[in-house]
Amino acid sequence: MDVMQVVGKSEAEASVLLGQPASCADIHRARLCKYGPHEDEVMFVRDKASMITVQGMDAVAFGADALDALGLATAEPDSADEHAIRWQSIPGLHEVAVFPGPGNSVDFAYIDVGKH
């Protein structure tokens, strides 16, 4: 998923890019929708895509190059350990984090726009 195409989009705009959601639920002051075969999650705050969880990344190696699979340029992480690799210096995003899965792959990625 090219996350920058989805960031800041409305639910209707995200559906054009990702297809119709498999499900949506209202959670507090936000709306959480799941898209595609991996049930990638997009949380809409004030009708803008503010948080994205990308699933189904098991073909991606757990490392700084994982940003490529998200449509982002490779960058030096701000922190990295065996539990997560985090970037807080990507323009337009508050944080990008990838979490390890089995066999040194990425389990999932979390993207926070930070403008709630």
Where are these regions (language model features)?
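Short N-terminal segments immediately surrounding and downstream of signal-peptide cleavage
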Residues: 1-9
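A cross-family detector of function-defining hotspots
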Residues: 9-116
